[in-house]
């Protein structure tokens, strides 16, 4: 009769050992794998107008959620609209000049140039004949040297006028020179470039959100006169959300780009976020003071950037995160 309690006692001991062993195995499986500590890293960007001017309106305020493509603010457009009108007029003038160069001269202009040559030729012939007569009179001492010189000057002037008229007629008949056409084309292209710049300036007097995010600061108010590039808003980008962590050389082989990990925060200790290693620094550095593990603080470590694939609004800049490696994380 005494054997039965002994058997029961042995069974209890064995059962307790099995339970303890199972618990130990479960805990070892839970703790198996590398564990790192890091912080949430959300990028911020300063938004500004590329051009300067007076702030006409701002459409958002601090704390507002913004969407990519949303209009955030506008400068006074009037100066840029006037500048655009001016350069458009310049393009029209340059285009007309270029077209004129390509078209050459009209028949009426050529006819007028030919008539001018005939007139200049007649004037030259008369001046030449008069000079010849004056030479004869000079030889007979009938006129003074001054009279002969005046006749020569008149002949030379008529000759120059004739040559100018002939050159003009030749140009009209052959059309504009290639160099003149090229110069007119270059002037047109310069005017078109100024037009493109004026259109861009007008476009950039409206501030557009480049991506989704949350407005952190609003640095100016309507009526402020800004220089180009002056900060108007600071925005926290919604995506991507990263975790910055550090790994020592001993465990570096486990932290390869593409490796999936689990990310735990104090607010969600039982419901991890999912992440994937996107970048591993190629150079070692001393561990930053923010790293919570004392045994790493004096080591050389490598920086990791882990992309949170299921991030939500609960993740905030600088929030501490535990990075859990393991078979479950690596093969999800």
Curated annotation (Swiss-Prot):
It is found in: Periplasm. Residues 1-16 form the signal peptide. Pfam families: HlyD_D23. GO terms for cellular component: periplasmic space. InterPro entries: CusB_D23, UPF0194_membrane_YbhG, UPF0194_transport. Residues 108-209 form a coiled coil. PANTHER family: EFFLUX SYSTEM COMPONENT YKNX-RELATED, UPF0194 MEMBRANE PROTEIN YBHG. Belongs to the UPF0194 family. This is UPF0194 membrane protein YbhG. It comes from Shigella boydii serotype 4 (strain Sb227).
């Amino acid at each position: 009769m005494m054997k039965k309690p002994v058997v029961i006692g042995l069974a209890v001991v064995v059962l307790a050992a099995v339970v303890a062993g199972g618990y130990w195995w479960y805990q070892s499986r839970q703790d198996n794998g590398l564990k790192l500590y890091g912080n949430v890293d959300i990028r911020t960007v300063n938004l500004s107008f590329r051009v300067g001017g007076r702030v006409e309106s701002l459409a958002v305020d601090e704390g507002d959620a913004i969407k990519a493509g949303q209009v955030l603010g506008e400068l006074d457009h009037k100066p840029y609209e006037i500048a655009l009108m001016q350069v458009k007029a310049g393009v029209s003038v340059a285009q007309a000049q270029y077209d004129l160069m390509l078209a050459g001269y009209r028949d009426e202009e050529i006819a007028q140039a030919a008539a001018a040559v005939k007139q200049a030729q007649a004037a030259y012939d008369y001046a030449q004949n008069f000079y010849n007569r004056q030479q004869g009179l000079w030889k007979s001492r009938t006129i003074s040297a001054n009279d002969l010189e005046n006749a020569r000057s008149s002949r030379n002037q008529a000759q120059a006028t004739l040559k100018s008229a002939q050159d003009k007629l030749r140009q009209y008949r052959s059309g504009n020179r290639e160099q003149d056409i090229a110069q007119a084309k270059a002037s047109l292209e310069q005017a078109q470039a100024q037009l493109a710049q004026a259109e861009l300036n007008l476009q950039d007097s409206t501030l557009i959100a480049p991506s989704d995010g949350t407005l952190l600061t609003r640095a100016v108010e309507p009526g402020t006169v800004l220089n180009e590039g002056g900060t108007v808003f600071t925005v926290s980008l919604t995506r991507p959300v990263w975790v910055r962590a550090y790994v020592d050389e001993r465990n570096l082989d486990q932290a390869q780009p593409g490796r999936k990990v689990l990310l735990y925060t104090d607010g969600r200790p039982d419901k991890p976020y999912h992440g994937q290693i996107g970048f591993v620094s190629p150079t070692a550095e001393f561990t930053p003071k923010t790293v919570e593990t004392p045994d790493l603080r004096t080591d050389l470590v490598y920086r990791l950037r882990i992309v949170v694939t299921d991030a939500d609004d609960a993740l905030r800049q600088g929030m501490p995160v535990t990075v859990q490696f393991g078979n479950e994380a690596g093969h999800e």
